[in-house]
Amino acid sequence: MSAVQEFLAARDFLLQHRSNHATAYKEFRWPRLEHFNWALDHFDAMAQGNENPALWIVEEDGRESKLSFAELSARSNRVANWLRQQGVRRGDRILIMLGNEVPLWETMLAAFKLGAVVIPATTLLTPDDLVDRVERGEVRHVVTSAAHTGKFDQL
């Protein structure tokens, strides 16, 4: 069984038993995924030619941002290439501090594709909060918006 098939079998088992916690807990077996990248092996494969909505953000003022699976896959590929050019490598810890906006989801998916470890951070964090997270998380890279770069001045 391929890694993708093992992942899907585990996912399907949990979905099948989602209302029976005891059975799900007792019988679930973690798939043996020696070489598996969810973003590349599952998401991108599912996204190929898939124009169904993958991301739909509705702002408080009613504005909407929509991306299909195919669009999100392609856009996250571009972000992954940019992150790679910035020096992000497999295993690097990357703190992502963006609001609920399209770039957040593009960047998260891109980081997964590169094998980076994502440390999500709310935009409500203070500079002191960020010092703690960056130090304890051994963060090597930060992605944030221009509005929040000043919060990193102490680092």
Give the role of each language-model region:
Residues M1-E6, Q85-Q86, L109, K113-L155:
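Structural core segment of the AMP-binding/adenylate-forming
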Residues M1-L67, E71-R84:
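N-lobe entry segment of adenylate-forming
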Residues D12, D41-D44, D61, D92, ...:
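Acidic-enriched, low-complexity/disordered segments with a strong bias for Aspartate over Glutamate
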Residues F13, N20, D92-L95, G115, ...:
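Small/flexible residues
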Residues E34, R63, L95, A121, ...:
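Short N-terminal micro-motifs specific to bacterial/archaeal maturation
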Residues W38, L104-W105, T122:
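Tryptophan-centric aromatic hotspots in well-structured domains and transmembrane helices
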Residues E51-L109, T126-V131, E135:
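Conserved AMP-binding/adenylate-forming core of the ANL superfamily
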